[in-house]
Amino acid sequence: MRDIGSIIESARERQGLSRAELAAALNVSAQTVAKWENDTALPNAENLVALIKMLNIDFSGPAGKEPPSYNSMGSIREIFKIGRGPSSSHTIGPERACLRFRSLYPDADSYRVVLYGSLAKTGKGHGSDTVIKKTLSPAETLVEFDPITPTPHPNTMDMQAFRGGELLGSVRVLSIGGGNVLFGDEVCSSPVVYPHSSFSEISRYCAEKDIALWQYVRENEDSELWDYLLDVWRHMKSAVQRGLRDEGILPGGLSVHKKAKQLFEATHIDESAETRENRLICAYAFAVSEQNASGETIVTSPTCGSAGVLPAVLYYEQQKHGYTDEQILRAIATAGIIGNIIKTNASISGAECGCQAEIGSACAMAAAALGALFELNTDKIEYAAEIALEHHLGLTCDPVCGLVQIPCIERNAVAAMRAINSVSLASLLWNTRKISFDNIVETMKETGHDLLPIYRETAEGGMAKNYNPIKK
């Protein structure tokens, strides 16, 4: 077992934090952090929990015992959230945080919200300040952007409530992706629903009981889930259909034209079946992604920025093969398990792990859903999801001008096609595979933490750096 000190030190350095910065975030002295890293002292239980959460580290605790596991899965409702775009972590997350904070201080007549990290750097482009002010209205709200002060989590916001100029209360909130938020010292954002948290555990259980993944969902979730998933599917279809009708230019200043309708109607007399399939799937993905970029209602799957992948695949398959809504819901439930495993054991946030955590996760979910529609066995579904995620490893999150447009919209279309290819490959080669889905989730997490911050939704590197037509 590695020493606790070396694990803390390497995790801190991976996040680009000095000892003093980490100490300030934990409200301890830099000397205390130094003692932890030199193994001359151990963090107490409260600090241990904070370190796990802030630095995304995994280590054995004092006396050689494993610390409590926080990798317990909540409901797949947390994967599929119905809301307005363009960003789950920058609009849906702050909106949910504001609603919750307002309920804590209903007598407040004014608020102050400070955004840090990625929230500060791309919040203007995502409209974070607009949604915060709108949600907390009619109270007067001051929103400040602080891209300089370091915080252990890239999507951090401080909220303060006032009445008559006097402070009523404050809280630090983390927007951890997919519209999920953590308040204060919370470690888990939702109640535990599933008894397992890895694909290997779930697969073993399903094999023992001879059930499919969607049946595993039905066994553990409440009976109202299926009504919720039907609502999810209706909103997904609505986003596709609206997007196929819409024309014009997306907001934000990049002058990006909506292309879904053009793709959908661009038929050719000599178009092959394969070309038509690709064109339609891309049109459906563009449709949802353009609705998201316009701030319209979509469903996170698992995020706003990757919301076009799963609906594109499912909508195409239902239109082509006539799958019933019940079959589609089973596929969505299967996709939800995949997204939940990734969210629990790694991240679905571009600010934490780059675009691989968003588009890569969405592609894996879509591949698993398609495998469920085709009634593939659990091993083949696992392999399809693994292929889909593996070949997005290292993908950077570098939105031009901080908008969820370039390269985000095209990536949804490419990932939708890749999901279908992943299923085709998995159905033929599943018994020759070497890498498990759990392996690739762990690898994605490590890869994401190794990415420089400029490639994690800060709009400071990659395409965001080299192409900026509206740069002042």
Regions found by a protein language model. Name each.
Residues 370-472:
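Functionally critical mobile loop/hinge segments
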Residues 135, 141-271, 279-280:
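C-terminal regulatory domains involved in ligand/effector binding and gene-expression control
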Residues 13, 24, 53:
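Alpha-helical residues within the helix-turn-helix
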Residues 16-35:
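Short alpha-helical DNA-recognition segment
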Residues 237-354, 462-472:
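Accessory "access/gating" subregions that flank catalytic or transport cores
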Residues 1-14:
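A short, Lys/Arg-rich alpha-helix, primarily the initiator
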Residues 44-61:
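DNA major-groove recognition helix of helix-turn-helix/homeodomain DNA-binding modules
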